[in-house]
Amino acid sequence: MNVLWIIALVGQLMRLVQGTATCAMYGNCGKKSVFGNELPCPVPRSFEPPVLSDETSKLLVEVCGEEWKEVRYACCTKDQVVALRDNLQKAQPLISSCPACLKNFNNLFCHFTCAADQGRFVNITKVEKSKEDKDIVAELDVFMNSSWASEFYDSCKNIKFSATNGYAMDLIGGGAKNYSQFLKFLGDAKPMLGGSPFQINYKYDLANEEKEWQEFNDEVYACDDAQYKCACSDCQESCPHLKPLKDGVCKVGPLPCFSLSVLIFYTICALFAFMWYYLCKRKKNGAMIVDDDIVPESGSLDESETNVFESFNNETNFFNGKLANLFTKVGQFSVENPYKILITTVFSIFVFSFIIFQYATLETDPINLWVSKNSEKFKEKEYFDDNFGPFYRTEQIFVVNETGPVLSYETLHWWFDVENFITEELQSSENIGYQDLCFRPTEDSTCVIESFTQYFQGALPNKDSWKRELQECGKFPVNCLPTFQQPLKTNLLFSDDDILNAHAFVVTLLLTNHTQSANRWEERLEEYLLDLKVPEGLRISFNTEISLEKELNNNNDISTVAISYLMMFLYATWALRRKDGKTRLLLGISGLLIVLASIVCAAGFLTLFGLKSTLIIAEVIPFLILAIGIDNIFLITHEYDRNCEQKPEYSIDQKIISAIGRMSPSILMSLLCQTGCFLIAAFVTMPAVHNFAIYSTVSVIFNGVLQLTAYVSILSLYEKRSNYKQITGNEETKESFLKTFYFKMLTQKRLIIIIFSAWFFTSLVFLPEIQFGLDQTLAVPQDSYLVDYFKDVYSFLNVGPPVYMVVKNLDLTKRQNQQKICGKFTTCERDSLANVLEQERHRSTITEPLANWLDDYFMFLNPQNDQCCRLKKGTDEVCPPSFPSRRCETCFQQGSWNYNMSGFPEGKDFMEYLSIWINAPSDPCPLGGRAPYSTALVYNETSVSASVFRTAHHPLRSQKDFIQAYSDGVRISSSFPELDMFAYSPFYIFFVQYQTLGPLTLKLIGSAIILIFFISSVFLQNIRSSFLLALVVTMIIVDIGALMALLGISLNAVSLVNLIICVGLGVEFCVHIVRSFTVVPSETKKDANSRVLYSLNTIGESVIKGITLTKFIGVCVLAFAQSKIFDVFYFRMWFTLIIVAALHALLFLPALLSLFGGESYRDDSIEAED
């Protein structure tokens, strides 16, 4: 008896040593419904399961791993192990790329189902009856160690699922953000959706009353575990570290290095300047150019104010004399043959007008406006469109409540009706609707509608439950799939993660039809939305594919330009009046008509060469040419008036010819400087800007020709018929302002130089603060509906634009090339495309996981994913999805597929399996390539010639963001020297200019300044004065640059051309004064001070009246333009130019010339004023 007791005791001890089972569940006891799953039977803790059979043990090892090989007792039957295997295989296609996550996932459910100590961490809390009237588990608690759960979640959270361009966690964990959400999703009862057949509640901190239980805390593997290491794309810890990017901005504290250097240099120069000024003042004891109470006559400046480089020259300027003689003959021919000149002019205008009406076209396509067809990015866009199809036509609508949450049940009801009408009923004039044009992921799919309504598949939810349902769908989008079967993340639909408190929701419709039918439907959509009655407190903004081009074309400021013309005409009529106050109405009209004629001639001439105009050219060029062209009319007319005063014995023709001889070299010099600057601007490759520069150049040339011929003829005819007798007398009244106010300011010329120099150096400090970009809201009229849309995109859109990495000419049938692309396998190159892009997500604007078709293709072949690549047994025929599993076998057998890529197809096999994959649907295998990748590859029977790998930028909310995103795309795509590839995104083509805009700006402005110096040196025959002219123009541009930073004028191709134009206009302010200072009558004193006074006496009035005030009046009108692009880039820049250039020309330049000006030449063509 004792022996039997001892044997029994030993047996019990052996069972304990070998792991006697403590079960909570064992076996299956039936279903809750006909279509439900088999549910386990609850068992008491005293229950002892039988020893595992060899067959069950072998199956358990196959499913759960080698560590189960020695297990003799388990809390599961063979049927449960089979069911466990089937359920685990559902998750394998999603997480098998990360062995650590897969191992942890399998371990959790293997222990939950079969562990011998199951009863120690599983507590059944609810039992129900099956259809067979047996007890079945309905709800239970699992006690889980929180550290184990956290490491489990961390091993899985970054696994990418390329087919959705998202994360596997979105599918297996409902988008969980932490381990508790992850396990809650896994444990929530979802029997009809393929989830848990009963409720599993995971608990992490045992309460006092739960101390009898133990926490599940088996071995867990990190994603960078040596044995189960995951690929870089799925595990940040496994990734190599990229070299840090060089910071392109040098700063010392908050200051750019350039600004700090300028400040230091400025401080040193300022000390020397004040010392110089103080010593000069002390030495001269306050001496000035003129006595405060005496108004000087020409040549009466204080001789103590000597030029630093004073020299005298009584020679004539040979080049100036030749030009004067040439244009004297032109003027003589014009006054002697006025009718021939005018008839020829009218005939030319008629011919060019005919050409315009017959052949001229306006360029309105935004792409053709902003990107050169020779641009690399334009060619890349063409390549993408030709090979992968044009990007979707996008219709996007924002519904916004700026004061509170946008969502209420009333809003839902209203929007469900609106959206249903748009997608189902709204039709164009051709009876074409959204269903006829929309994007469908597959041929048998429904239309893609990216809207929160699709969480409910377009059916209005119940009033009592809509908030709860919407929140659940927002947390777990995979549970609320729309009819097109793609999860919709909340960042795509709402302005905030807290969707019930979001201020806006976004609806996006996608069209793939790029025909006139799509245009007409979009026009109908636009009409409908503009007339849509919106509930109180809400507003909508929207954009259709045709909106931008249409609104740009509606940007009509012709009335503003017309008013500008009228204002300058009225001013010209007044400013050209005679000394007795009588106006010269005809001359004012003539000047205006000549400007218009030059524009017409230029447009017709360029039309012959196929150069298209744009709306901006049509609206801005007239103003620009009027602002430039009217100046020469003032110069000619004022010089003629001076001849009338000084040479009354001359005939009218002689006075006009003399005026032309005197002013023509100056006019030609200014004309060449301006046209040269405009031609330099033509080097900008952006078509709108390039064409603008060409039109400006040709218009200025025609304007100059017509002014020196047609206007001269009109002036001759007008003066002869008016029979005007010159009034002579004292000119002190007329010149009193200049002689008392202006010249007194000039007496402080050293102080003026110090002030302007300080201004210049201060401006240099601000230059690094100039921002790059061209805000889209500036390009459209301010009353356009697109203004609100662009603002809402920046404020409320939480998804960034897509990026496509296009790889060409790479033979992917070879293993070595496959390893340059892949990311999910252990032998992928360390710096493969997938690995580098995974790392770039952490430091660049590209933040979405890469949709890597090659990885998905190879994962599709994984035999563990037995619903993916299948062949009919014994044949090479593909098993259709509906074919029973027993009649199919996986393409690769167990053991022939490995994460080290051994056995992966190459050569001909690669293309054969590719054909199977690319035609496979996503159901039942999510890795099937047809839906996500059917348009991502260009291939034939032997090779893949090109393919795209999709990712996306983070939300871009400013022009700076867009520029940085473009730079990132270019930088990353160029970091693979062994690959023929480029990055493409629909917006890239508009940001090409910014890649080299900074250096280009310096080159073009520098070239323009050098050109001015060269031309002025040729005309003036004086290096020193030419240098001072170029210096003053440089200072004008630098000061304008600083004001651009302060006034919020960004640098882009438009403002760059304006800067070049500013160089040309800045020359106009200064060049006539410099030439008048250099070429003087023989009777004028040759010292610098006397020449400055002579220049201001003769040219100063024309600069003020003909140049400064004319431009000021014309520019001010632009402030009332509808388009902000006029306000910012034309009104602000040109207004700034007028003020800055006038101050420099009328104050700084005379002071500079009087101190440092070059030698003079005698002008024998005129006599000095008395």
UniProtKB/Swiss-Prot annotation:
Annotated GO biological process: sphingolipid metabolic process; sterol transport
An annotated Gene Ontology molecular function: sterol binding
Main location: membrane
Note: Present with 521 molecules/cell in log phase SD medium.
Residues with glycosylation annotation: 123, 145, 178, 314, 401, 513, 900, 940
Transmembrane segments: 260-280, 341-361, 556-576, 585-605, 616-636, 667-687, 698-718, 752-772, 1000-1020, 1027-1047, 1054-1074, 1099-1119, 1133-1153
Protein name (Swiss-Prot/TrEMBL): NPC intracellular sterol transporter 1-related protein 1
Boundaries of every SSD domain copy: 557-717
Protein encoded by which gene: NCR1
Record's GO cellular component terms: endoplasmic reticulum; fungal-type vacuole membrane; membrane
Organism of derivation: Saccharomyces cerevisiae (strain ATCC 204508 / S288c)
Pfam families: ACR_tran (PF00873), NPC1_MLD (PF22314), NPC1_N (PF16414), Sterol-sensing (PF12349)
InterPro entries in the record: Acrflvin-R, HMGCR/SNAP/NPC1-like_SSD, NPC1_MLD, NPC1_N, SSD
Signal peptide coordinates: 1-19
Keywords: Disulfide bond, Glycoprotein, Lipid metabolism, Lipid transport, Membrane, Signal, Sphingolipid metabolism, Transmembrane, Transmembrane helix, Transport, Vacuole
Family: Belongs to the patched family.
Functional note: Involved in sphingolipid trafficking. May recycle sphingolipids between cellular membranous compartments.
UniProt topology in membrane: Multi-pass membrane protein
Compartments in which it is found: Vacuole membrane
Disulfide bonds: 23-75, 29-41, 64-110, 76-114, 98-230, 101-156, 223-235, 232-239, 438-447, 473-480, 822-828, 868-925, 869-891, 879-888
